Amino acid sequence: MKAQTILETIGNTPHIRIQKLFPGSEVWIKSERSNPGGSIKDRIALAMIEAAEASGELKPGGTIIEPTSGNTGIGLAMVAAVKGYKLILVMPESMSLERRRLMLAYGAAFDLTPREKGMKGAIERALELVEQTDGAWMPQQFENPANVDVHVRTTSQEILNDFRDTPIDVIITGVGTGGHITGVAETLKKEWPNLKVFAVEPQASPVIAGGQPGPHPIQGIGAGFIPANLHTQALDGVIEVDAAVAKDMARRVAREEGMLVGISSGATLAAILQKLPDLPDGARVLGFNYDTGERYLSVPDFLPES
């Protein structure tokens, strides 16, 4: 393919069958690490910026300020670099060093907030910066409708294109902003009425399941609150995952399937492993690989000791 800019290569990511981790089961993973910025968040970064340009909220020479746990920030940094915007990213200090360095490589500036305040603290700080900065615009990924819409227009259609004649029975996927699980669930359930969709969240912060927020090391999911973009009525259940098991599954899929994935993708694989015994024989399951494991090599216990 030929592209006029790197942004034209966002989307159309492959679906890869897992061969060894789940013997006797048909499990597919949508490889969002194949996006040019390396994660599923490239989709929403471009969509939110283009929507703001169209509405006039973001003007040439403007500044983008966003609270992010990392991957949205990297996607925004890539898009901002192409389009010529200044970008300030706000995130908890617990986010991995690799993510921060990637943002810097794209030319973004960032502001770190206390880890114990989680994403709530990052959002509060970002709102302060918007008030202090002329020409600032905040995408607000947790509530921006362009977030859900891009998954309706692109992600869902890609799944339909590949599985129209062999429908997916169960989708199991994590919740960060809520955009992709909402967009995919609401769109695909219209095509496949029997489709079941399960959200994955950290056992240590089971907010969607009705529990209390808490600190956890599964970066990218489990924000500690229910985002406006998460339409819980589209879900058929929640699967809670232990962080140690998520890291173990991330290591296993690298060594057994050759897929180097992040911790949140490991959490999805752990949730699939947990749910498979409850599913009917022959169920076709789809999960997501949100980003690459290269972003977590410095995270404690992500790599085996030897």
Describe each model-derived feature in a short phrase.
Residues 1-306:
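PLP-dependent amino-acid enzyme catalytic core
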